[in-house]
A protein has these predicted regions:
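Structured, active/binding-site neighborhoods that engage oxygen-rich ligands
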Residues: 1-111
Length: 111
């Protein structure tokens, strides 16, 4: 079990770091930049190390799974997604940026 937890922890860190590396370059052509360091600003004008909705939603998903003894509870998961989207939970400094989810009737109807 410890090995599985360590693998999960490594995957979560890898996701968050990779996401933060990519945030400044989102929507840019792959050949238009060289990512050599963690930088800030760029596409979303966020500080270096800021992750996006991808990591926030992964954290909300994991929080739901852990809170429900690793069972999928769709309603709980949706509540956690809404906590991210509307209250800034799982987001750095509570700042939700670049989210089209607030305009999506499928996500807002569950609120």
């Amino acid at each position: 079990m410890i090995e599985t937890i360590e693998q999960l922890r490594a995957a979560v860190y890898g996701q968050a770091v990779g996401d933060a590396l990519g945030v400044p370059y989102e929507f840019q052509d792959r050949d238009s930049f060289a990512c050599a360091n963690m930088i800030g600003h760029g596409t979303h004008n966020q500080p270096a190390g800021t992750w996006s909705d991808d990591t926030s939603m992964m954290l909300a998903t994991l929080d739901s799974l852990i809170g429900n003894d690793w069972q999928v509870d769709i309603e709980d998961m949706q509540h956690r997604f809404n906590a991210w989207l509307y209250d800034g939970e799982y987001a750095i400094d509570g700042n939700v940026f670049d989210s089209s989810y607030k305009r999506n009737p499928q996500t807002t109807s569950f609120r």
